[in-house]
Structure formats: structure tokens, C-alpha cells
Amino acid sequence: MALTKADMSERLFEELGLNKREAKELVEMFFEEVRMALERGEQVKLSGFGNFTLRDKNQRPGRNPKTGEEIPISARRVVTFRPGQKLKARVEAYVGSGE
């Protein structure tokens, strides 16, 4: 099971009393702000949750799994996520509870 943007919108509708259109717009706006910050090369810090950062990966050798031929994997920029201590603790507590 996965949490979707629609699930988040539904939760805002139920918990905060926003209408469904407002809830959907709020979720979309949040993710658009995160996307735009990352596009500008900025780090995104969500207190109590974690950090999204950009990392440059160098070109490296790879292999075509079908042919075994060696091919270069081009340099690229990737988004990484590092969970914060509070999130780590909550996940560990949940996993430790046997649920």
C-alpha cells in the first residue's frame, strides 16, 4: 500500500475541513514548491521529517545486461533524501511494535 497525493488531499478534507478542491490545490502547491526549490539547486529541509538534496554523480562504467557490452553511464544530478532523527525514531518504533 502506498500513500498518494489523492490520499493526502482526502485527509486534509477530512481533518481540516477544507473543501476537496482546496485540499487538492494545497497538496499540489506543496509539491510544486519542493520541485521548484530543487530545480533551482536548493536544499529542501522539512523539520522533523528530513532533507532533500541534490548530488552530482560522475560518469562511470556500466554494462548492458543483455549483451554484456561495457557502456558508459553518463554524469548526472540526482535527488537524495536523508530522513531526520524524528522520522527515523518513529519508523523504528513502528517496526519494533510488530505491526
UniProtKB/Swiss-Prot annotation:
<dbReference type="Pfam" id="PF00216">
    <property type="entry name" value="Bac_DNA_binding"/>
</dbReference>
<dbReference type="GO" id="GO:0003677">
    <property type="term" value="F:DNA binding"/>
</dbReference>
<keyword id="KW-0233">DNA recombination</keyword>
<keyword id="KW-0804">Transcription</keyword>
<keyword id="KW-0805">Transcription regulation</keyword>
<comment type="function">
    <text>This protein is one of the two subunits of integration host factor, a specific DNA-binding protein that functions in genetic recombination as well as in transcriptional and translational control.</text>
</comment>
<keyword id="KW-0238">DNA-binding</keyword>
<dbReference type="InterPro" id="IPR000119">
    <property type="entry name" value="Hist_DNA-bd"/>
</dbReference>
<dbReference type="InterPro" id="IPR020816">
    <property type="entry name" value="Histone-like_DNA-bd_CS"/>
</dbReference>
<dbReference type="GO" id="GO:0006310">
    <property type="term" value="P:DNA recombination"/>
</dbReference>
<dbReference type="GO" id="GO:0030527">
    <property type="term" value="F:structural constituent of chromatin"/>
</dbReference>
<comment type="subunit">
    <text>Heterodimer of an alpha and a beta chain.</text>
</comment>
<comment type="similarity">
    <text>Belongs to the bacterial histone-like protein family.</text>
</comment>
<dbReference type="GO" id="GO:0006355">
    <property type="term" value="P:regulation of DNA-templated transcription"/>
</dbReference>
<dbReference type="InterPro" id="IPR010992">
    <property type="entry name" value="IHF-like_DNA-bd_dom_sf"/>
</dbReference>
<dbReference type="InterPro" id="IPR005684">
    <property type="entry name" value="IHF_alpha"/>
</dbReference>
<protein>
    <recommendedName>
        <fullName>Integration host factor subunit alpha</fullName>
    </recommendedName>
</protein>
<dbReference type="GO" id="GO:0009893">
    <property type="term" value="P:positive regulation of metabolic process"/>
</dbReference>
<dbReference type="GO" id="GO:0006417">
    <property type="term" value="P:regulation of translation"/>
</dbReference>
<keyword id="KW-0810">Translation regulation</keyword>
<dbReference type="GO" id="GO:0005829">
    <property type="term" value="C:cytosol"/>
</dbReference>
